[in-house]
Amino acid sequence: MKHLLLIFGVCMSAAAFAQAPVDTTLKVVHIGETVVSATRSSQARTAVAQQVTVLRQAEIEQLNTSTAADLIQQSGAAFVQKSQQGGGSPVLRGFEASRVLLVVDGIRMNNAIYRAGHLQNIITMDNAALERAEILYGPASTAYGSDALGGAICFYTKNPVFAEAGESLRSGGNAFFRYGSANEEKTAHVEVNVGGQRVASITAYTFSDFGDLRMGENNGFAAFFGKRRFYADRIGGRDTILRNPDPYVQKFSGYRQYDLLEKVVFRPNANSSHTLNVQYSTSSDIPRYDRLTDPGPQGLRYSEWYYGPQQRLLAAYKFALQEWGWFNGGVRATLSYQNIEESRHDRRFGNPQINHRMENVGVWGLETEAEKHWEHQSMSMGLDFQYNDVQSEANRENIETGVISPQNTRYPDGGGQMYNIAVFATHSWQVPGNEQWTFSEGLRGGFTGLKARFDDKMFFPFPYDEATQNTAIWSASLGAVWNSPEGWRLALNASSGFRVPNIDDLGKVFDSQPGSVIVPNPDIKPEKTYNFDLGITRVSAERLRWENVLWVTAFRDAIVTDVFRFNGQDSVLYDGEMSLVLANQNKRRARIWGFSSNLEADVYDDLALFGSLHYTRGRILQDEGDDLPLDHIPPMYGRVGFRWHTPRASVEGFLLFNGSKDINDYLPNGEDNEQYAPSGGMPAWMTANLNGSYRFRRVLALQAGIDNLFDTQYRVFSSGINGPGRNFRITLRVRW
């Protein structure tokens, strides 16, 4: 209670000592805003037919979240699933993981081993280094290519600041330290900017140490669920089941993370620039919390289950011209290389053998774009190329003797390669003489190829040495926007999307759940979506923006994991036990529909109200019998709150809420993780959250906040770990 009063007092004192002038950076209505994600080039938001949510730098700092996954969830922009604390898998319009595209500074993060279940790669994006983020809803394949079925989350990192006219050098920076009580979080961030007239650089480094996550203790809308009553540990050379002295602490969920950004920009003249962009993220081992709670014959199934350090390296060079001949909107070319290292390690309770499976992915990319503008029209065109090289290794170690023995790899042991090359063009135009109407079109076409080789057949006698695919791809979009003088906006958008099978889809061998194993199927083909949006928005005097969007998506040739026969058998011996054979197959048609409503209102110069609501429904279409529920469909969720702000102080309070998900609306044996939910399904939940900040002087600011004010015990749908309980946060920021 003392902590509660202290944090509340800090938040309220910010209001008491604030100055009268208005801080416009924290306004919620931004009428003249431009967005980049929809067409990969800057465009007025009012002219974009596709639904877009923008998270600006001031809002990112105000939310003050621990990871990029938490940023997306706390903002209410998307639903986020978690299997462990070091994770976060965004869901956009009923699509998740490899069906949602992640983009950083215009470069695809998705690679050839992004899986269709749940992912945690988003946490390798340092949210403390972000300038903004844009969430694009609905298929975005025309602009970005494969994987953007449900949409795209586009991150834009901070850019260095140049010296102004008359200055020889401009330097500055900022640093902060944050503490959070629910997981004993300790995060430190430092950022330095040095800029001259022609060269400028920014360096940012973040270190985070997260302890075991404490869940809430108040049951909210349902019975208590998810307590960690027992855990496995090794004592005296033997696996032992121990009683957790505090069952609200989710034992073995903590981890550490390190993030680095270095960006250097050289401007030889006013028309051209060269940018070197280097990003590196790594972590400690990350415990797979949900698997560590799986029951087994001796109490728990696993003694160890963790991801090894998750490493992401990005090195990119970008050349840009403001104008180049006919292309008066400029040209840009980005050459990039990414290296991703992932591993997973598991050992069953009482078994001295631990399995190690390691993956390395190298990704080379080239993106070129050119823009042309006329009086009432604009056009953007470009070329995309990516090449993925996947190497997979595995072994089994006896932790008692140190003996190393062979083990089957997660992906083809002979390596896998995947390429895609495509050209795209987008065009928009305003009707001359009636500029209330804006029309847009887009088209992408190209080819993708994949090859995976199976060398060692010790564990699986595959009837083939390699699997190959070569596929033509295409997508298109068509939009119309009407902006009336009275403040009404009508947007119509039709688009298609695609996702080509990657190495994970085609060549993976692993256990999706105990007692089953997924084997390769070289005959799968791309997934496709066809989408239609209707958006109605009311804008009033730059004080109110109320957006409502209805949408429907037809999902065709969906890749699903289903029963399969391998060498004529429906079961094989895998990891020491007979397992049901499954494989990815194009066996599903589905329909997904829903709506969203977003309200932003600057009620007074210093007071804003906001709210968002998202509803999604998905059904698998059956040729015979009743339709089935589609997995990855979240319950209704949303966010509602207020923000009071001045140049020195701000206070923000909001509710995050999720509806319930009945167990009958889960897809049996799908990706909804019904085994980690109560018997009747996932209960509804709501958390109250409060943030406050006060700037004492130009160089010093204090932020304080309380997440989950009422210490509600809850678990997000499809997740394998409970959400954090009451979390006191305090952050000290220094700028120079």
Language-model features and meaning:
Residues A68-L71, G88-V91, V103, Q120-I123, ...:
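N-terminal periplasmic accessory domains that precede
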Residues N183-D209, G220-D285, Q311-L313, Q430-G433, ...:
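Transmembrane beta-barrel wall of Gram-negative outer-membrane proteins
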Residues M109-P139:
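Short acidic/polar hinge/loop motifs at secondary-structure boundaries
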Residues P21, K251-Q257, R267, N271-N328, ...:
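Flexible loop and strand-edge segments within Gram-negative outer membrane beta-barrel domains
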